[in-house]
Amino acid sequence: AGHEVQVSDLYAMRWKAGYDADDSGAPPVGEFWRPTLDSKQAFAQGTQSADIVAEQEKLLWADTVIFQFPLWWFSMPAIMKGWIDRVYAWGFAYGVGEHSDRHWGDRYGEGTFVGKRAMLIVTAGGWAEHYSPRGINGPIDDILFPIQHGMLFYPGFEVLPPLVFYRTDKTDAGQFADQCAALAERLDTLWQTEPIPFRRQNHGDYLIPSLTLRPELAPGQSGLAVHLRSE
């Protein structure tokens, strides 16, 4: 489809998953190591470790970011979560924008990655029915909510519906060909696909500073689905 691609193969890169004081390249802020303040200082002063900077540059370069991973214990593998922990620095992916009685930071629909799109490609060993609305594992959209809403929408990405493949350890050649075709179709239509309609934090749907949904919106309802626009 003519896309230019950069790949971060975390296992091949031997990516360091744990964020620690060595990532800042500078003395810790204060007597005790405080990860958020350490991250803020390192990003502001340009002392982050080189591997973190390289991944941040990829994010700024891309117009679409795709996270592909197996579903391990209802989430992404630790190495990818560690990528988020280290690359999403204060001042880069969070801690941006003003905080006032009308605007609570640039996040949840605003932020560094506004204008960019993100999508998950997930492989799961269980059946699709296991992840259905009444399935034993819970709905797949609920399982992926902390990633799609909390890790992607939070810093500003428009989040596309995920592409999930089930029973992947039982995939035969014909099914694999179908999966490849489904993936190709999604890649060809990245910019025509409607994003998940998450509510934006600072656009009137939430009370500030409590950040609770206004009572007149989805009255009497609770749960993750209330954070989706219904109109």
Predicted feature locations:
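Short aromatic-enriched loop/helix-cap "lid" or pocket-rim segments at secondary-structure transitions
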Residues: 17-22, 131-133, 174-176
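Generic structural signal for helix capping and beta-alpha/helix-loop junctions
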Residues: 15-17, 128, 169
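Short beta-strand elements in bilobed, periplasmic/extracellular small-molecule ligand-binding domains
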Residues: 5-8, 158-166
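C-terminal/domain-terminus segments
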Residues: 1, 136-141, 173-181
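Well-ordered beta-strand positions
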Residues: 64, 117, 161-162
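N-terminal beta1-alpha1-beta2 submodule of the flavodoxin-like/Rossmannoid cofactor-binding fold
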Residues: 1-96, 181-231
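Short, glycine-/small-residue-rich phosphate/pyrophosphate-handling segment
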Residues: 95-153
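Basic, glycine-rich
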Residues: 165, 169-172, 185-188
